[in-house]
């Protein structure tokens, strides 16, 4: 994988290297800057990449789970130069991150010639939020079977050549949603995948953008209050309310609110029963307060986007409700992948080709 050359060090590169050496207590900053200038290019070392990825998580204004930023496992995969190799690395990412249900935070960083077209590694074809991406996959020759919760294939591009790959069943860990009391909720046939892996972001370190796949673990509200509940998603609150026997004839019965709480109860119960790590919104917001306290002791300001940090369920009961943050994100950071100005050549995978 070729590395991008720069005639001189940019201010962003200088700032990144300066912060890296300061925070890590690494000597030799003048020598490092001089070596980069003499070479005429900057290609981060593995140590610089690892620090940059961890700090990008620390700086993420949309993430409420930043307390564990130092525990991020960073996989330096910049040398991979085929779609097949990237695909195999992503399968390993899923296995490493799931860790038998003891989910751990992992990031896989690729070279600049790689593009992961999927917004997340695991998404469903019948989820309305994925409608545009499903249309894109259709143009590349994939045909959905029309099943509920059908896992989408991966579209991986390397140096302008795109290939489709199916995720084998053993790579996709899912949890069936049941309720500890209401059997009717379990009869709805709901389920969700255990591992959220964001794959449409780039890691911005010193102005260098590298594609990556980043995963932590779910907060139950992400699944129960958004994915399964939003009207523009799976819109399951009416079905949950019927399973609970609630009066849905008028809004003043608060049937939506009651169904929403019980769906959250069901998701928490189901992940616990399956032995899969899942945060709850009260604990994770308390952890964010601890994160803020640690950062204050280190002399660093915590920035955040309030609407992302405050949960969609009972937000006023959490400690973040009354807090305010500056929203502008600092580098290192995660940024949305830029859309390419070319149409990749599409090839059928010779490995796990998607089924239709």
From Swiss-Prot:
This enzyme's EC code(s): 1.14.14.47
GO molecular function: heme binding; metal ion binding; nitric-oxide synthase activity
Required co-factors: heme; (6S)-5,6,7,8-tetrahydrofolate
One Pfam family per UniProt: NO_synthase
PROSITE patterns reported for this sequence: NOS
Reactions performed catalytically: 3 reduced [flavodoxin] + 2 L-arginine + 4 O2 = 3 oxidized [flavodoxin] + 2 L-citrulline + 2 nitric oxide + 4 H2O + 5 H(+)
Regulation: Nitric oxide synthase activity is increased by trpS2.
GO term, biological process aspect, one: nitric oxide biosynthetic process
Swiss-Prot/TrEMBL keywords: Heme, Iron, Metal-binding, Oxidoreductase
SUPFAM superfamilies xrefs: Nitric oxide (NO) synthase oxygenase domain
Entries under InterPro entries matching the protein: Nitric_oxide_synthase_Oase-su (IPR017142), NOS (IPR050607), NOS_dom_1 (IPR044943), NOS_dom_2 (IPR044940), NOS_dom_3 (IPR044944), NOS_N (IPR004030), NOS_N_sf (IPR036119)
Binding site residues for heme: 63
Highest taxon in the source lineage: Bacteria
Quaternary structure, from the entry: Homodimer. Forms a complex with trpS2; one homodimer of trpS2 binds one homodimer of nos.
Note, other: This protein is similar to the oxygenase domain of eukaryotic nitric oxide synthases but lacks the reductase domain which, in eukaryotes, is responsible for transfer of electrons to the ferric heme during nitric oxide synthesis. Affinity for substrate L-arginine is increased by TrpRS II.
Function: Catalyzes the production of nitric oxide. The complex between TrpRS II and nitric oxide synthase oxygenase catalyzes the regioselective nitration of tryptophan at the 4-position.
Family that this chain belongs to: Belongs to the NOS family. Bacterial NOS oxygenase subfamily.
UniProt name for this protein: Nitric oxide synthase oxygenase
Organism of origin: Deinococcus radiodurans (strain ATCC 13939 / DSM 20539 / JCM 16871 / CCUG 27074 / LMG 4051 / NBRC 15346 / NCIMB 9279 / VKM B-1422 / R1)
């Amino acid at each position: 994988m070729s590395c991008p050359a720069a005639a001189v060090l940019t201010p962003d590169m200088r700032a990144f290297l300066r912060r890296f050496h300061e925070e890590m207590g690494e000597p030799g900053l003048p020598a490092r800057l001089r070596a980069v200038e003499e070479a005429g290019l900057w290609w981060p070392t593995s140590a610089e990449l690892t620090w940059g990825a961890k700090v990008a998580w620390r700086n993420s204004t949309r993430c409420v789970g930043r307390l564990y930023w130092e525990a991020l496992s960073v996989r330096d995969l910049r040398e991979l130069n085929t779609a097949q190799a990237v695909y195999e690395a992503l399968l390993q990412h899923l296995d490493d991150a799931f860790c038998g249900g003891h989910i751990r935070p992992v990031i896989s960083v690729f070279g600049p010639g790689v593009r992961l077209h999927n917004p997340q590694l695991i998404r469903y074809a019948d989820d309305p939020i994925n409608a545009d991406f499903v249309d894109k996959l259709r143009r590349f020759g994939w045909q959905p079977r029309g099943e509920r919760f059908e896992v989408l294939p991966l579209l991986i591009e390397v140096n302008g050549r795109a290939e489709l790959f199916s995720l084998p069943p053993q790579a996709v860990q899912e949890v069936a949603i049941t309720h500890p009391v209401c059997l009717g909720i379990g009869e709805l046939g709901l389920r969700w995948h255990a591992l959220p892996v964001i794959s449409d972001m780039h890691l911005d370190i010193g102005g260098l953008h590298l594609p990556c796949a980043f995963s932590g673990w779910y907060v139950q509200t992400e699944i129960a209050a958004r994915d399964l509940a939003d009207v523009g998603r799976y819109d399951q609150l009416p079905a949950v309310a019927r399973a609970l026997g609630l009066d849905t004839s008028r809004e003043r019965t608060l049937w939506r609110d009651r169904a929403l709480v019980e769906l959250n109860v069901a998701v928490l119960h189901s992940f616990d029963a399956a032995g899969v790590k899942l945060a709850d919104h009260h604990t994770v917001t308390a952890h964010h307060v601890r994160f803020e306290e640690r950062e204050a002791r280190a002399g660093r300001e915590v920035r955040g986007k309030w609407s992302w940090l405050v949960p969609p369920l009972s937000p006023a009961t959490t400690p973040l409700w009354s807090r305010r943050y500056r929203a502008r994100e600092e580098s290192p950071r995660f940024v949305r992948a830029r859309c390419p100005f070319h149409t990749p050549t599409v090839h059928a995978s010779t490995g796990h080709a998607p089924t239709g």
